[in-house]
């Protein structure tokens, strides 16, 4: 017997899961279980299937009804002869109503049900073989099962269903009334009561009422689902209505979007207008200031570049040098000495580079600095000479004096001579190769001969090192050989102060020469 195909497995489980009792989990009652316990033939959810796996395969064997495709015919027969309804009734009959998984499936009732499912599945496998359906199972209908009624499909053709329902509904109501009327008339004729006309009046009214009800029901049926279900009457809307409503909604959305854009653009325009007004006011104020100052040419450009209180300031409050500047006329003006080098330069030479001012000699400077010519100039010349001496140089090997430098030994002139000299030696050093070893040995022998008469020697004496000074002999010059004294420090401070004052005087003089005249 071969294994069932994938299509057979899907067909069988589709039918088994259509049973209402199999649509919920056997243990917890969760909807749409997709796992199954073959041992008991019940359907489980994924959480309960994990609990069954922890019990072991000897108590419960778990398979997926959707993912697993290696089902056997015996396992399918277990699911067909079992089911949630059969298992629930069997456990209830044997008094096993607990919800504890371990206690429930380790009980005597679970053991009996396992044996029963196994026996029934073996019998069904031998009897039916590879047939999809058993005699005990409900044979699937030849026609497809009725589908659930679609809401929109019922709207598409409401007249047919409603008219059929309406035509079938009033027939039972007509039959008893028609039967009662002849009975009443037949009973009235032989008896011949005292007043037959009075009896005919209510019957006509009743017939009229029946006819009115019959006429109203088809009209109510045309209203769609409202008449069919007996609830509020819902009217069918055509496709054109939906299109019109959608167009109206789109038009409303467009209008709202335009209103939002207009509302957003209005404050922006107001801010732009206000900023333009402020800009025009600033320009007017600036023009008035320019007219008052009567500045033109290089002076105006220079003042704007320096930012001397003009309209370029960020805040509303600013200090203006040019606005407070006044022209002072001297009674006996002194003509300034011509400056050839500084006159040729651009007007902003003092602000672009300051090193050129200090590089010039003292004789070329203004007469206002004559007090510095005698003292500072001579001192600077001496200071430059002094400063060059204490600056230590990073002397290399070639800058050392010749007395301390060891002459480089000449390399061997001929390689054959080196081979003859060191041919039998196993290892040689660079000193031996270049002839330095003999000189070192000579110096060592000389030191040993000099110290041979002494009773004790030290490593400093042996290697000709200078003795270290005692603790009491340390002084400032030995610890800091290049430390400056107070006189040099004072002279340095004076020189720096003199340079700063000269620079400040030069700046002020240049400003007065350019903007004061």
From Swiss-Prot:
Protein's GO biological process: COPI coating of Golgi vesicle; protein transport
GO cellular component assignments: Golgi membrane
Keyword Chaperone: no
Record keywords, A-Z: Coiled coil, Cytoplasm, ER-Golgi transport, Golgi apparatus, GTPase activation, Membrane, Metal-binding, Phosphoprotein, Protein transport, Transport, Zinc, Zinc-finger
Region: Disordered, residue numbers: 139-200, 291-349, 362-422
PROSITE patterns, A to Z: ARFGAP
Domain Arf-GAP: 10-126
Pfam families documented for this protein: ArfGap
The protein's name: ADP-ribosylation factor GTPase-activating protein 3
Species of origin: Bos taurus (Bovine)
């Amino acid at each position: 017997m071969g294994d069932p195909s994938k299509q057979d497995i899907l067909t069988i489980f589709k039918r088994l899961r259509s049973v209402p009792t199999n649509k919920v989990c056997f243990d917890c009652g969760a909807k749409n279980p997709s796992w199954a316990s073959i041992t008991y033939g019940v359907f489980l959810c994924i959480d309960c299937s994990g609990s069954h796996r922890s019990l072991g395969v000897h108590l419960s064997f778990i398979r997926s009804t959707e993912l697993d495709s290696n089902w056997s015919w015996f396992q399918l027969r277990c699911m067909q002869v079992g089911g949630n309804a059969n298992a629930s009734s069997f456990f209830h009959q044997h008094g096993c109503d607990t919800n504890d998984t371990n206690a429930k499936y380790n009980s005597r009732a679970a053991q009996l049900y396992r044996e029963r499912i196994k026996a029934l599945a073996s019998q069904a496998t031998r009897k039916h073989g590879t047939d999809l359906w058993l005699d005990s199972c409900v044979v699937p209908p030849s026609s497809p099962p009725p589908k659930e009624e679609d809401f929109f499909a019922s709207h598409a053709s409401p007249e047919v269903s409603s008219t059929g329902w309406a035509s079938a509904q009033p027939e039972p109501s007509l039959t008893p009334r028609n039967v009662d009327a002849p009975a009443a008339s037949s009973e009235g004729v032989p008896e011949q009561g005292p007043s037959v006309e009075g009896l005919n009046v209510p019957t006509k009214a009743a017939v009229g009422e029946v006819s009115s009800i019959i006429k109203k029901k088809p009209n109510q049926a045309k209203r769609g689902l409202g008449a069919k279900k007996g609830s509020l009457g819902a009217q069918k809307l055509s496709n054109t209505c939906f299109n019109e409503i959608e167009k109206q909604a789109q038009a409303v959305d467009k209008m709202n979007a335009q209103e939002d854009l207009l509302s957003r653009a209005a404050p922006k325009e107001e801010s732009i207008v206000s900023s333009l007004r402020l800009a025009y006011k600033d320009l007017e104020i600036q023009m008035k200031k320019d007219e008052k100052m009567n500045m033109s040419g290089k002076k105006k450009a220079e003042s704007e570049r320096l930012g001397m209180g003009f309209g370029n300031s960020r805040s509303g409050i600013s200090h203006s040098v040019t606005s407070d500047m006044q022209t002072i006329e001297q009674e006996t003006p002194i003509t300034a000495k011509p400056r050839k080098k500084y006159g040729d330069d651009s007007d902003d030479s003092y602000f672009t580079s300051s090193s050129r001012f200090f590089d010039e000699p003292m004789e070329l400077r203004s007469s206002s600095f004559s007090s510095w010519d005698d003292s500072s100039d001579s001192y600077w010349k001496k200071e430059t000479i002094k400063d060059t001496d204490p600056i230590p140089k990073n002397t290399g090997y070639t800058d050392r004096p010749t007395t301390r430098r060891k002459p480089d030994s000449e390399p061997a002139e001929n390689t054959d001579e080196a081979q003859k000299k060191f041919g039998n030696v196993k290892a040689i050093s660079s000193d031996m190769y270049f002839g330095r070893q003999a000189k070192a040995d000579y110096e060592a022998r000389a030191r040993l001969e000099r110290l041979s008469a002494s009773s004790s020697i030290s490593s400093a004496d042996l290697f000709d090192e200078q003795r270290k000074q005692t603790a009491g002999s340390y002084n400032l010059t030995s610890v800091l050989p290049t430390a400056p004294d107070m006189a040099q420090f004072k002279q340095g401070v004076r020189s720096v102060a003199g340079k700063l004052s000269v620079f400040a005087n030069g700046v002020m003089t240049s400003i007065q020469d350019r903007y004061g005249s």
